[in-house]
Regions:
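Metallocofactor- and cofactor-centric catalytic cores in central/energy metabolism, strongly enriched
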Residues: 2-136, 177-289
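Aromatic- and glycine-enriched beta-alpha-beta binding-site module
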Residues: 105, 117-174
Length: 289
């Protein structure tokens, strides 16, 4: 396999889906193949409709037990759906051919809690002691929302979903702690009630919203300035609806400061073979680690 260890700043143009063959992202395997081959490194919203997508956290083994406990203690923002064997990039429970070194469109590399670079391939950084964690993602429930007749604004606008750090604190486990990060989609109050009922059936994709309405109530000062992603329009009669977000572990890693960890870049997810409604939590609050 050709090593694509290049900075994303050198990848101008391959975030554009228009130049790819029709139907390339209709299946998980097709989406991953485009990413793995270097033909695409953009956001994954709307890809392989009906299938699960995952956030990524890769850590040295010495840090893995505490992070597993952190997921158990915080299942809403950190719903664990897949985990590798030590040193293996494979996640067979989510897809037979998944390779965590190449199959995420864009990775973030963190050293001692600092973001040092973004890459579209981490093969050169892979270590024999790495453990990979895949966490459920809100992009997994967007197809379910659309099938009920609810539009997803950031998809319609061709943007990455807006994400915000909040004043809601996660439960600390070992060195991992910090604020919950949330994603936002605007709906009317009636639509929000429908969205909540739909998403409550999908706990492996963050479940029901954690907050609806006033952003200031959860510590968001300016809804027009997300911490990650892109701002999206909120129309007259709509309220912001907030879900737990799998970028939360990145905030926790900034506090824990492991010597090296690798995550996905927000909005650039691992597309899985498992249907969104077939994803299962590997551990939940109260389970034994």
């Amino acid at each position: 396999m050709t090593d694509r260890n290049r900075s994303v700043e050198m990848e101008a143009g391959i975030h554009d889906r228009a130049g790819l063959a029709p139907g390339w992202a209709a299946t998980p395997a097709g989406a991953r193949a485009a990413v793995r081959s270097g033909r695409y490194n953009g956001n994954t919203s709307g890809m392989a409709p009906g299938h699960g997508q995952g956030n990524l956290m890769i850590l040295p083994k010495d840090w893995a037990e505490d992070f597993l406990g952190y997921c158990r203690a915080n299942p809403v923002p950190c719903p664990l759906i897949g985990m590798t064997e030590t040193g293996s990039p494979a996640v067979p429970m989510l897809g037979d051919d998944i390779d965590l070194r190449t199959d995420v469109p864009r990775y973030r590399v963190w050293r001692h809690g600092e973001l040092v670079e973004e890459r579209d391939d981490i093969s050169a950084l892979w270590q024999d002691d790495f453990v990979g964690f895949v966490l459920g993602c809100s992009l997994s429930f967007e197809d379910a929302l659309e099938r009920t007749g609810l539009r997803v604004r950031h998809v319609d606008e061709g943007k990455v979903v807006p994400m915000y750090r909040t004043s809601i604190q996660t439960t600390r486990v070992g060195p991992f702690h910090g604020p919950m990060v949330v994603s936002m989609r605007p709906y009317t109050p009636a639509e929000a009630a429908i969205a909540s009922a739909v998403c409550a059936q999908l706990p492996a994709a963050h479940g029901a919203p954690v907050h609806m309405g006033d952003p200031a109530a959860i510590g968001i000062a300016d809804i027009g300035c997300p911490d990650e992603g892109e701002p999206t329009a909120i129309l007259a009669g709509e309220i912001p609806v907030f879900w737990g977000c799998g970028v939360t572990p990145q905030a926790a890693a900034m506090m824990a400061r492991p010597p090296l960890c690798i995550t996905h870049a927000p909005g650039h997810m691992l597309v899985c073979d498992v249907p969104a409604n077939g994803l299962r939590l590997l551990c939940a609050q109260g389970d034994e680690v």
